[in-house]
Amino acid sequence: RSLRDFSMNSVGVEVKTTSRDTSSHLVQGVHQVELADDEDGGVAETRLILVSIGLKAAEPGDDSFTIPQLVDRISSRLTEAGGHQLAEGFLTHVSEYGAGSGLGYDHRTMSADPMFAMPYVTKFFRGYDMTDPAIEVLRRDDIAGRHHVDVSSVRFRVDLPLAASAG
């Protein structure tokens, strides 16, 4: 299993972005939409929140941000809150994200790269409780009965509603 984007005690947080008008996201495996257990030595999760952030290219005059600006802001806040080591850990984590696919971003060496200068605005920001039965996505148990399918190889797109609640 991969590590969560964020963990707070037994609550996992997966962050996904999209340029679509809806909360439509590619999922790298069922581990991104299911509670983590404690088999890998980590903490068993009791809750998993998928944060869906919709982005669009900014128009002139919009209150926008670029990826380097966003990373700078987060890094500055982390330095103020917890010191230089916390910010350095964040920058290291950012550089590891996507590095295996060749699509990563190393803020220390790429912040001036024109490829990352495109300004964005946030269209929406939503949180989904992935333990809510109203969230109907592919789960490990859906695949487990297919003995000739490697569960860890399954990638798929989730199209989440504006809001969901089984209660």
Report residues per predicted region.
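Nucleic-acid endonuclease domains
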Residues: 1-2, 18-167
